[in-house]
Curated annotation (Swiss-Prot):
UniProt topology in membrane: Multi-pass membrane protein
Protein's name according to its UniProt entry: Altered inheritance of mitochondria protein 11
Record-annotated membrane-spanning stretches: 29-48, 79-101
Cited PANTHER family: ALTERED INHERITANCE OF MITOCHONDRIA PROTEIN 11
Swiss-Prot/TrEMBL keywords: Membrane, Transmembrane, Transmembrane helix
Family from the record: Belongs to the AIM11 family.
InterPro entries xrefs: AIM11 (IPR038814)
Gene it is expressed from: AIM11
rRNA-binding keyword on record: no
Annotated compartments: Membrane
GO cellular-component term (any): membrane
Length: 149
């Protein structure tokens, strides 16, 4: 005998759905944590590079001494760090938002935001009759819009 939850859904289906849902949320979390790690590592490297260039004067020396600059040797790593920080921050924003909204693919994003080129209808929800309170509320709002009240 199969255990049945309310509305005739077998417990096995519920357990399978729950397991898939947990794996999906775990994958979304790992994407966010990975992008956070990239951002933090890039920021940490940028800060240590900036501290290495800091000039600390000895007693009776000028407060500012122009640093020795070799543009060829410093431009590439600086560009890589800036790109890492920017891409990491953007990926944190995107993966965090997708984690909050429970979106894993672009197809789901299009369906949720209504950008889908194909019309997706949910027949169970489209033709459901309204209950009496909801129907009365709809008619009252229509009367207000038409100016009858």
């Amino acid at each position: 005998m199969v255990d049945v939850v309310s509305e005739g859904i077998p417990v096995q289906d519920v357990e399978e759905f729950t397991e898939k849902y947990k794996n999906r949320r775990k994958q979304q979390m790992m994407r966010f944590i990975g992008s956070t790690a990239v951002t933090l590592i890039s920021c940490r490297l940028a800060i240590t590079r900036a501290k290495a260039r800091h000039y600390v004067p000895n007693m009776f020396q000028l407060n500012y001494k122009p640093p020795v600059v070799t543009y060829k040797g410093e431009t590439g790593p600086a560009l890589v760090l800036a790109t890492g920080i920017t891409v990491g921050t953007l990926s944190m924003l995107v993966s965090g938002s997708c984690w909050i909204w429970d979106i894993s693919t672009m197809k789901e994003f299009r369906e949720i935001k209504g950008f889908s080129s194909e019309k997706v209808e949910h027949p169970r929800l489209a033709n459901m009759p309204l209950e009496s309170d909801s129907m009365r509320n709809v008619y009252e709002r229509l009367e207000l819009l038409n100016g009858k009240k």
